[in-house]
Every structure is written in structure tokens, then in C-alpha cells.
Amino acid sequence: MSPPVATESMYKPTTIGTEAHDQALAAMKSNQAAPAKPVFKPEPAVNLEPIKFAPIKEHQVQRAMVRRYFQDMEERAISDVIIVGAGSAGLSCAYALGKARPDLKITILESNVAPGGGCWLGGQLMSAMVCRKPADKFLDEVGVPYEDEGNFVVVKHAALFTSTVLSKVLAMPNVKMFNATACEDLIIKPCPINPGVQRVAGCVTNWTLVSLNHDHQSCMDPSTITAPLVCSFAGHDGPFGAFCVKRIASAGLSEGLGDMRPLDMERAEDHIANKTREIVPGLIVGGMELSEFDGSARMGPTFGAMLLSGKRAAEVALQSLGRVKVEEGEVVGSAK
């Protein structure tokens, strides 16, 4: 037998007089009244000097920022070296290059607001940063402490390396970083040294928020930075991952991408550190971007090759610049 169907006649609401209802509600509230909350009374601060900031106008802040930013953009319209990506490899390259040649104008492009790439943490969001030897020598040079575990060393927190090398790089007077700025294309021109060969001659830049919204708003043209040499460490993931090697492939300047292979730490680190190189005239590639180009294994949460790939890129860059004659940021021939 089916259960009876619920109808209005079966379930009539109970009604009581308004006065009785109010009395019952008041009694219930009085019985359930919450105890008085304790009041925190802070102890008064004593013997503290008052803080009084110097006066300032809002327009002064605006002009101070705008003037310096656009002075930097004007000055760096021609650079000696552009570094794409301020992760562990890119920052290591900037440090080694800036230290070796303080006369070079080194411009760093970082698409994120926060530089550092994946080197704020170790593997799976854990803190420690593992570096296989001989990368410990670079840590010594930069001044990052670590624990020695035999064949490898451990920095207690990856952010300690990133913040240390970042502060040293940005303190160099010849280094300028534009963060929240994407490399969204490359400048490519005929190579004056090798007829019929194309040469990377700089970067096409835009603010990252603009680059990521081209699908929503048309006609948002970029800016450019001219340089005889670009060093790219754009990584392997994210919206701009491996950007430069992908652009080289799409422009028909390489046979294509090798695509990163599955993880093998030993093979991966040896390959990345030793194969960092100038893949086409004017473009040096290192770090995990190189694994996408060469089709080498990924290395996972070990960072030694990132550091030494950046350092090797700086060495390759110095040799490359020594072979060319440069006028107004463009290679015009071979060095005599």
C-alpha cells in the first residue's frame, strides 16, 4: 500500500496568539543569552619614539615612479644582452655575466610579477633545495649556506638562494629587470656574417597582462628591445614556457622541438649543463627550455644544473660577443 500523499489538510501549521508568541520568544532569548565577551585591554606602549614621516604629495610619488621606469625603458631600448626569464638559471646567468662584465647593459625580462621561477620551493611544495655537486661552488660564490650531504648539498629553503642571488643581481648598476613584462616575439634579421642565415636581434616585449589578453582586445601593439644577444631561460611550462625555442621552431629556423622527455636526474642535469649553447645566431638557450628544444629528460627537484647552465650561458655569451662587431645594438660584422 502506498503511503498517504502529503496534503495541506494533513499538515496545517500550528497557530498561536501574537502576544503568547512574543512572550515565549523573549523567555527563550533570556535563557540563551550569551555570556559577556571578555574585553582585551592592551598594555600602553611606553618609552617608544613617535614615528612621523616626512611630508609628501601624491604627484611626487607618481612622478618618481614614472620618470625612472620610462628612463629605464628608453636607455634599455638598446641593450648588450637580454635575459628572458628570471628563474634560477636566468638569475645565475645574470649574476655571472654582470660580475664578469660590469660594462655590459644586461636587461632581464620576467613575465611574472615575482621573479624566481620555480625556485621559491623544492619538490612538491617542500622547502629544501637540493643541488648536486659541483654546483656547491656557485653557492659558495654567491654566499648561500647549505648542508653537505656528500654528492649533493641542501639549502634549507629554496627561497634563500633565490632571494640572495636576486638581491645581488639587482644591486648591480649594469643590470635592469622588467618584471610583469613578457617576451612575446623575437626580432629576427638577416645575419651580416653568414649570408642566407637569420639572426636573433632582440626581443618584442609587452606587459604580461596585455600579452595574455590579446584574444579579448585587438590592436595592442608591443615594444622592442634591440640587442646583439638574447639568453633565454623561459622554462618548460606556464603561458610563456619555452617561448623562444617555440618561436624559433614556428619561424622555421629550427627543425622543430624535441619535446621534454620523462624524468632522469643524472642524464638530465649533465645534458642541460653541458649543452647550454647558442642554438641559432644571437640566441643562447639553457635551463629547462633547452630540454624542450633538445628532447632531453626532465630533472625534477634538483637545481644544480639550473645554476651551472646559467653560468655556462654567461661564458658562452662572452665568447659570442667577442666574435662580433656591434653598432647601436646590432651585429654588423665579425670582430677584427
Swiss-Prot record:
Main location group: cytoplasm
SUPFAM superfamilies assigned: FAD/NAD(P)-binding domain
Enzyme class: transferase
Keyword Iron-sulfur attributed: no
UniProt keyword list: Cytoplasm, Iron, Metal-binding, NAD, Nucleus, Thiamine biosynthesis, Transferase
Subcellular location(s) per record: Cytoplasm; Nucleus
Similarity comment text for this entry: Belongs to the THI4 family.
Protein name: Thiamine thiazole synthase
